[in-house]
Structure formats: structure tokens, C-alpha cells
Swiss-Prot record:
InterPro entries documented for this protein: NusB-like_sf, NusB_fam, NusB_RsmB_TIM44
Gene: nusB
Gene3D superfamilies associated with the record: NusB-like (1.10.940.10)
NCBIfam families, per the entry: nusB
Function description: Involved in transcription antitermination. Required for transcription of ribosomal RNA (rRNA) genes. Binds specifically to the boxA antiterminator sequence of the ribosomal RNA (rrn) operons.
Highest taxon of the lineage: Bacteria
Cited PANTHER family: ANTITERMINATION NUSB DOMAIN-CONTAINING PROTEIN, N UTILIZATION SUBSTANCE PROTEIN B-RELATED
Pfam family, one: NusB
GO cellular component: cytosol
Organism phylogeny: Bacteria, Pseudomonadati, Pseudomonadota, Alphaproteobacteria, Rhodospirillales
GO terms under biological process: DNA-templated transcription termination; transcription antitermination
UniProt family annotation: Belongs to the NusB family.
GO molecular function: RNA binding
Keywords of the record: RNA-binding, Transcription, Transcription antitermination, Transcription regulation
Protein's name in the database: Transcription antitermination protein NusB
Source organism per UniProt: Rhodospirillum rubrum (strain ATCC 11170 / ATH 1.1.1 / DSM 467 / LMG 4362 / NCIMB 8255 / S1)
Amino acid sequence: MALQDDKPGSAPKERSGRQIRSSAARLAAVQALYVLDLAEDARVDQVVLDFMSGSMGGMAIVEVADPEGIFDPTEEIAALEPPDGELFAMLVRGAHAELARLDEVIGASLSADWPWDRLEPVVRAVLRAGVYELLERQRTPPRVAIKEYVDIAAAFYSGAEPGMVNAVLDRVARSARPEAFGGGV
């Protein structure tokens, strides 16, 4: 089992294997959507197959701290946890099939400070996967989905991007699933 900090200053809590595979599926889906966004000739079924077979994805550059704290951290390539294949494929195929609708929802949820043309490809991929999951996967609690995608954004960006991802996904979730936030149905 892996540990995850729930809140700053709180004790880490154990995550189940299923939760870890779901998180890995979300990260892999963001990576796959990024590939599909940038590679005009990429086919969604081939990208899904490449990720599931391990020929794409599955690795990350991680920072490793010096145990004595004398030297700067070093970077190493590490294997990622295997993703939940069903969730991964559903997110990639679904988001890719619904790009126009997702982009419209995202565009309507952006603030004036973050117009569509300011979004980098990684941010677009994070938002597309997150919005698709919020709209189409009712069994995922919205707060869980939002946290997962904000964490993914934070893995790529140290600036304002994770906060923007949080704001957009929160707006979408509150509109699409108000009952999860104490709103009416």
C-alpha cells in the first residue's frame, strides 16, 4: 500500500491498490490525451494499446532527495504503478470522442485570466480528462476527481496552473453534479 498525505500536517493514510491503479489510470489518460492532441496522425485505439502494452507511458522522472541532505536532489527514471485499464481506456476514448463538447464546457468555465489560447497542451489534457470524468463517471465522487486532477497538474506545474485546474473542475462539478455539494436535485 502507498501512503498519501490527505491534508498538510495530518497523518498520511493508506491507499488501496484499487485507488493507486485509478490514480495511475488518470495520469496515463492525461498523457495519452496529450499525445493525441499533439500528434495529428495518432489514432486513439493505437494510443490506448500502446499505453496498455507499456510501449508508451509507464515511466516518470522523479526527484530523489539525498538522505543526509548534503547534496541537491537527483532525478531518476522510475516505473509507475500499472493503471486500471478499464478506467484508462474509458477516459481516453470517451474524452477523445467528446473533444468539442469538453472544450466548450472548459471554455465556458475559464476565467478572463485564463483564455483558451493560454492553455498549454498538458493543461488541456488534464482538463479534458477531468471534465470528462466529472460529466460521465457518476460513481467517482466529484471531490475525488477534482483532487486527483489537481494533483496531476501539480506534478507538472509549480505555478498557478493547479489552482486554475481546481477552479475549472470545481465550476464544472458544481454545475453538473450539484447534489454532491449539498445543492438540489
